[in-house]
């Protein structure tokens, strides 16, 4: 970033994964259309790549890298995916306290510990907490992406009545389900 870019106000697009995810690419492009670089406020992006983080030291390094890349706090942070929020939340306890956060694509429950997140353990009542509980001390708005399972199955049945079996395929990542 140039000196002038660092001095300009900006919104930070913070992704849990990488730019190669098709829907993240589309979402990012839509945001970029609305924040042209010659405007009064810029849109910057950062990709945490949470799926490759394996321990607390790597998480701390990711947090430090984020703060080093953006030493001036953003006006707002848009976070895609609750794993990115869980990894970056400690920054909002300190240097970025009270910075507004918009969290997109969050689950109703999140890992109760960093270790649960990093272990990629399936969430249960015992190892997770409601997202509202995790968020209670932050200036955050959560945009939930509902599942329309019943509606989707009904639509499939209407469009293709000959279909008798459907395979549900997932790689156990919320964003890819």
Regions inferred by a protein language model and the residue ranges of each:
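Short hydrophobic alpha-helices and adjacent helix-cap/hinge residues
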Residues: 2-177
